[in-house]
A protein has these predicted regions:
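Acidic, polar-rich low-complexity tracts and alpha-helical solenoid repeat scaffolds
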Residues: 2-14, 22, 27-272
Length: 272
């Protein structure tokens, strides 16, 4: 029975040793020898065991792009073999190792479309989520991929909550949501600098409402104090400052918010 790798290797920690460990875990009972090494992956009719083993060996030696192509050949040449199912998921993993994340996603999705109830479905969903996660860029760029990573990680957690994949997905979700909140904060600050206070208020409120467990919430509340005062809403500013103080006492953003309200709306502070 095939045992797929539990934790796909990350982009910044990929190694030949781990690749070899992954490959060795995929040895199948009755597997034939590796045979000769083809110069490329052009179509050459080969028996399924030889072809699969060649793909596995290429992966173990760190040649993930060729391994992926060879695993694809297993399915193409032997579509009705039990090896084809194994090769589909190993193709997805090989593309992931090769940092060809779009193909990794496509291969894993193909596996799930054909084998939705397979025992390795949790791994396929997890691999899709990681392939999106690895493509997350800095907050200055479009966050479409980040949203896709968030959706995919949530799907892993929803479908397989008791698995180790879900445990890791939850950890990554925290990072993803912090990233998305950071983007909202960047846009909100831009609107503030442009004097578009209502637009800024909407962004900061979104952080407070939808990303309240992230590290950006204290600043978002402070920015809501700022924008409320700029809009001539001192009572709203006081409300946000109070929420900030109740949830983050001693935080530098609360100290700044308190001072700001004291300077801009001293009568409200005196009345409190």
């Amino acid at each position: 029975m095939t045992s797929f790798p539990k934790q796909p290797v990350r982009r910044n920690s990929r190694s030949l040793l781990l690749g070899a460990a992954i490959a060795s875990s995929l040895v199948l009972s009755g597997c034939a020898g590796s045979g000769g090494e083809p110069a490329d992956t052009a179509y050459v009719a080969r028996d399924v065991e030889t072809l699969y083993t060649e793909a596995r060996d290429r992966l173990s030696r760190g040649n993930a792009p060729v391994a992926a192509a060879l695993f694809d050949e297993v399915e193409r040449q032997h579509p009705y073999s039990p090896w084809a199912r194994r090769a589909q998921l190993m193709s997805a993993f090989s593309y992931y190792v090769a940092a060809d994340y779009n193909k990794a996603i496509q291969s894993a999705q193909r596996f799930l479309s054909i084998h939705p109830g397979n025992k390795d479905a949790p791994y396929a969903y997890y691999l899709i989520a990681l392939s999106y996660y690895e493509q997350i860029s800095d907050v200055q760029r479009d966050q479409k991929i980040t949203e896709q990573a968030r959706t995919a990680l949530r799907e892993v957690n929803r479908r397989f909550p008791a698995t180790e994949y879900a445990t890791d997905a939850r950890l990554k979700l925290d990072l993803v949501e912090d990233h998305l909140a950071g983007k909202e904060m960047e846009i909100g600050r831009y609107y503030q600098d442009s004097g578009k206070w209502i637009a800024a208020q909407i962004r900061f409120q979104n952080v407070v409402d939808n990303f309240q467990t992230t590290s950006h919430t204290p600043e978002a509340l402070y920015r809501l104090v700022e924008s409320s005062l700029a809009l001539g809403l001192p009572s709203e500013a006081k409300k946000y400052a109070a929420v900030l103080g109740a949830n983050y006492p001693g935080n530098e953003w609360y100290e700044r918010a308190y001072k700001l309200v004291q300077d801009k709306a001293p009568s409200l502070v005196a009345a409190s």
